Amino acid sequence: MLRYYGATRNLPLVFSINKFMLRPSSFARPFHYSSYSLQNDDTPDKGSTNKSEIRTPNNTVWKENIELQWQHLKKKLNELYSRFNFHRDQLSFQVNKAKKSIQEANRKLSEQENEINDSRLNYNKDELTSAKIEGLPSEREQHRKKWSRKLEFYFDSLQETLFTATRALNDVTGYSGIQKLKSSISLMEKKLEATKKEHKLFKAQYANAIDERAQSQREVNELLQRQSAWSSSDLERFTQLYKNDALNARQEQELKNKVKEIESKEEQLNDDLYRAILTRYHEEQIWSDKIRRTSTWGTFILMGMNIFLFIVLQLLLEPWKRKRLVGSFEDKVKSALNEYAKEQNMKMDKLLPGKSSEVTDQGNTKNSIVEEHIEQRGECKINTAETDRPEVATAEATTTAMKSFRDIWERIKALFVTLKSIQYRKLDAPLVFDTLEFYLYSISLVSMTILVSGLI
């Protein structure tokens, strides 16, 4: 509210935002920070004009803050609801996909049962020996229990739902095209079966049409033989047979054309199915060769990585670890011997106070003896650690010269005995090999890996 105390006597002019009013000065409220009085000819300064702004009520500020908080909370709730809907849709999609996979597994199981009972797929005669071929996969499937086959189909169908990486791998390796070719082959087989049924139907209709026409022609010939003795009914019958003969000839020709068309379609489907099956087996052979080459190279890469890691561990990490252990052991021994020497010096000082100089000299000599003892302990630390394993000591004591295959075999046996005697649970137990044993171990590892990969 703005107030103006001006030239009028005792009636101030009160300027308000809402209304304009006059009231006595005794009833006017005193000056506060939201009103500005201009008495006589006083003019406000620039500093006071900045304070002439109207103060907003507290309830308006409170409403604005509440509204901002409500809008922010509403936005968060909308985001949470949209996220919940997204995850719900994803869950329902996966559940429906799992249901479809189970239905597909049931369908495959029923198809397998039908294939077992199909007489066309039961040919098991060996042409060379005229004996029965045994050990076919279909026979083994027959001997399996139904629940195990059903469980296998369920796992195979759910694998496509749970492991989408398989589909990506198939796309990368090209097996998705082979699967499409397999599905097209199954569709072609169904079309061929339907075409064969249709061919049989039209062929039967064509045979019936030929029989009907032949019968009508025989009846016409009989009527023509006794043409001189025709009656009115014979004349009507001859006329009807003549008309039917024309219709039968037309129907016979149509059925003949349809039979030819169905036969050509059946031959085309047979040729396409034969070529599709050949293409499928050819592509599967190419795919299997590609996967075999990839697995071989992967095996070699893994073998190289193992050898590299073994070399790094034996040539870099193990010496560093051994050096660190030896250094920590030396520091502990030095600190322990120094403490022991100090204690002995203090005891000698208490017992013989007059001979302190001699004690100090003896302490110096003891320190020199301790240092020499530490050096000797640092040099023979590995040898003392190896006394618990006589096999390792004997392996290092043997000469590196080998003169025959028997020496090589004995050396390899000693190497494996050494490996067997290693205490793997103790991290501070060093692995001691010489250069020849290391090369023998690497060569045996490489040869065994190549042998296993070749057998696979």
Swiss-Prot record:
Its main location: mitochondrion. GO terms for cellular component: mitochondrial inner membrane. Residues 71-128, 178-277 form a coiled coil. Residues 32-296 are mitochondrial matrix. GO terms for biological process: inner mitochondrial membrane organization. InterPro entries: MDM33_fungi (IPR008839). The keyword Transit peptide applies. This is Sensitive to high expression protein 9, mitochondrial. The lineage of its organism: Eukaryota, Fungi, Dikarya, Ascomycota, Saccharomycotina. The gene is SHE9.
